[in-house]
Amino acid sequence: SVTTIREMAFYNCAYLQSITLPAGTESVGNNAFDTCTSLETIDFGGAKTIGQSVFYGCTSLKSVTISGECTEISVNGDGDTPFMDASALEEIIVTEGSGNYCTENGVLYNKDKTTLYAYPSAKKDKEFTLPSTVKEIAQSAFYHAVNLEKVDISGVETIGTYAFEECSALKSVKTTNTITSLGVDAFFNCTSLKSLRFGDKLTTIGSYAYGFYYNEDADPEND
């Protein structure tokens, strides 16, 4: 039976819409489903390790199911999880098991829910409140969450690089005086966000943590 899905194994399978890997699958290689543009659902079967950029170019992917025995979801060279590449993703499901991950309402966390790893980009909810256990928002966790307008991150201590980048609908972020670190580009290009409030525990602010690209030539007031 199949135990390994190698790198680029399903590369550019343009008509593949759904796939369920065997329960005996142990590992899935880097870019395994690269450019599967029609793929909407994937079940990783029993895979314990999932490689880098496995969803690169999977522009139709809506649902991902991961084994509860999974111990590693690899990040790429820039530190991003594979979910950053899935712009149509609505839910992530982790089955029961003794691995390192869990999900709640389609959102991916580590097992004890102290780190939020991935919020699906196309999740339909407009408001979201993090579980009180979460202390860290991982790199790119909310990247391009296009429907998210209001988020409550009370109790969080660390906000990773690119954490909320390109959340263009985001208008409100509720925080508490617990945040100590704000990563590079953390709220970059959140064009609907008018204000952010942090307490005096914040000691590190990464470059371009909030802001947006400004094109002077495109501003009618400067014509």
Indicate residue ranges for each PLM-predicted region.
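Beta-strand repeat architectures
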Residues: 56-57, 78-88
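A short acidic (Asp/Glu
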Residues: 76-77, 208
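Structural signature of tandem-repeat unit edges
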Residues: 1-4, 13-27, 36-49, 59-72, ...
